[in-house]
Amino acid sequence: MKISYNWLKDYLECDLSPEAVAEALTSIGLEVDALEQVEEIPGGLAGVIVAEVVECEDHPDSDHLHVTKLNTGEPELLQVVCGAPNVAAGQKVLLATVGTVLGADFKIKKSKIRGVESFGMICAEDELGIGESHDGIMVLEPEAVVGTPAKDYLGLATDAIIEIGLTANRVDAASHIGVARDLYAYLKHNDIPCRLNIPDVSAFAEGEGEAIPVEVTAVDGAPRYTGTTIRGVKIAASPEWLQKKLLAIGLRPINNVVDITNFVLHEIGQPLHAFDAAKIKGGKVVVRRAAEGEKFVTLDGVERTLSAADLMIANAEESMCLAGVFGGEDSGVTESTVDVFLESAYFNPVSVRKTSKRHGLKTDASFRYERGADPLAVEYAARRASLLIQEIAGGTVVGKVQESYPEKIVKKTVDLDYDRIENFVGKKIGHDVIEEILGSLAYEFVEKREGGAVVAVPSYMIDVYRECDVVEEILRIYGYNNIELPSAMRMSVNAPQKPEPEQVRKSISDFLAANGFVETMNNSLTRSEYYSKLKTFPEAKCVRIMNPLSSDLNVMRQTLILNGLEVIAYNINRQITNIKTFEYGSVYSFDPETDGKTLASYEEHTCFALFMSGQPDKSWRVDPGKGSYFQLKGYLELLLKRFGCDIYSLETAAAPADLFSEGLSYALPGSHQPLAVMGTVAPARLKQFGIKQPVFAAEISWPALFELVRRNKIKYKELPKFPEVRRDLAILLDESVCYADLRKSAFRVGKKLLKQVGLFDVYRGDKIAEGKKQYALSFVLQDLDKTMTDNDVERVMSKLLSTFQNEFGAVLR
């Protein structure tokens, strides 16, 4: 946002230089991105001076040129050839000396014109850029002092443009008065002489006659709406002072009425809109929602299709303006306008934001409305603009100001405890200093008591709700640099946690990256509609954002899975179909059974999530096959195994059906603490994101995983000296028997001799009865003390088969 230094000083009298102002603004949280010195005329007419024509004779080889000699204040006269018809001896003129650059690139050089040398140029108004006349040279007053720089003689203004990187919560500073208010508080606190001048609008008066009425049918979109009717205006170019102010901040002057609305916008921060009253059909203004599919042509000449959610300013027959965003092509002020309807309103920030985003329109008005304009500045801005219109464009206010304001907006109040504020600040700054700073920031003291107060927050400070917000305001003005660091730090030293969480996390990330997974980082904010149909993560448990910038980012995520599906959908839409990703991040939830006023109502913890979808590219050597549920389970098993954890030792249950069509959830044995959930993502969730290929996902609770890692201490063993023996076993089982149960029983029976169990084939079909299946199992046996004999092996295998027969009804094949 651009602020003109000269314009700023209209409201704040102080002796600070532009550089000092920029430094002060940065210190109070309005970070200055750039400071640019500008001149009324580019270059400041450097090299142009006042000179006196001492001699003027006709050119010997021309019927219209003159050879002049000028006194420039130097001992010798300067010869210049001039073609102006009005040049004469005795005149005081403006001379561009050799080396001067006029305009963009017109450089004055020593030249020879028809055989006569010339050492400069006597200038006309248009050549200097101060007018449009080229009828002759510019003749100055006789009192002009020879040698005076043109910049000083003409009184050309210099200015400094301060560019502020405004954060989303500081819309109160999106104007010259807004910046002046903040700067005033800073200067006053630091005992720097200053005075705040807010333009007086007490001269505004309503008139006689009948004003254009206002009807608001969408009060939720326009909580406050006013309209002022001004008749008999004369549309013309704005006065020079107004044009200069707008040009200084990069705005193009249009006409006096439109320029006044832009001026007030950047002066106060309140957007205004001027309508040609003659184009308001039916003689009334209606604030309503658009009809679904309604067509509307905006000022840029583009026909737009409206949504039923768009708020419109209309007349009795048709729409005239996208409320708070952009005007219509046929309703604006033109040269033929005589009567004006001036709108000043407070529009719902969410409504404006959605309309602005939906139609891809970003304007100065929408910038302020969607961040939250000052609802109590509506009347002041209307009066200020009306007085300026009457002063500059003429006309009179007709009738009463029309207003729709069904529910009065009151200032927020905050209860303050001064001792608690000083604890927040980290320094005893004094109760009187707290009150002095708040007073300079225009806080009103509703109630004062010993050690505290109740204050009314200025209506333009839309981000201040709580005591901690007020503390931030106090700190901005007091100065973070004035909070000294203590000479000694008191802290308890804790032994580092073993194993260190960050090392475990890095080890997991390295493992996944080595196996082809790509790490992603998603926004913790997401949209609430993702949770509207979930039972596992119900929408009621979402932590909601108080002032969301967008409905797409209005809650904190409860799970990483939905964000991961967003990433997969994004990549698939860009022809990337083979996807393996993982993410480490926080998830949040809220207990809807509580009042939400304490931290106990909220929960935050971190998770790992893995995602697989698609099929890797084939090579001439190998067909990798499609990703599958079991492939993802294998990665999870290997991941846990790295930290000495056996996935088969965990408690298992079915994965939640609203997230997975098939899958398992795991919990720590004994404590039942949830560890992970994994499986094939349910079709309903895939449809939600427009994904048409299978997706396999897992979400792992970081606290539970770290607890598992902490429990299972890794032990190092000597490499075995004696060989392994492998045996296979094919058995017929009921469909209800699962491999995990067989595996547990096998290790219970095999004890120290059984090293590995594997399932290498599952068969159903011909010669297998319905409800039955055949498992082909492999067993790896090893004795660490000796080489196993055939008898040793057969003894173990017999025990295994007997166990399977007794516990699971297995039949040897």
Segments predicted by a language model, with ranges:
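Mobile "lid/hinge" segments at catalytic clefts and subdomain interfaces of large enzymes
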Residues: 114-129, 133-139, 150-160, 164, ...
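Terminal amphipathic helices with adjacent charged low-complexity linkers/tails
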Residues: 183, 187-217, 393-421, 428, ...
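Extended, well-folded interaction surfaces typified by the phenylalanyl-tRNA synthetase beta subunit core
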Residues: 414-582, 727, 780-784, 792-813
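Phosphate-backbone binding interfaces of nucleic-acid-interacting proteins
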Residues: 1-205, 341, 360, 364, ...
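Conserved mixed alpha/beta core segments that line enzyme active sites in large multi-domain catalysts
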Residues: 49-81, 147, 243, 255, ...
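Beta-rich nucleic-acid/ligand-interaction surfaces
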Residues: 40-44, 203-205, 264, 456, ...
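A carboxyl-terminal module marker
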Residues: 2, 439-446, 467, 522, ...
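Glycine/proline-enriched, intrinsically flexible loops and inter-domain linkers
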Residues: 5, 23, 28, 40, ...
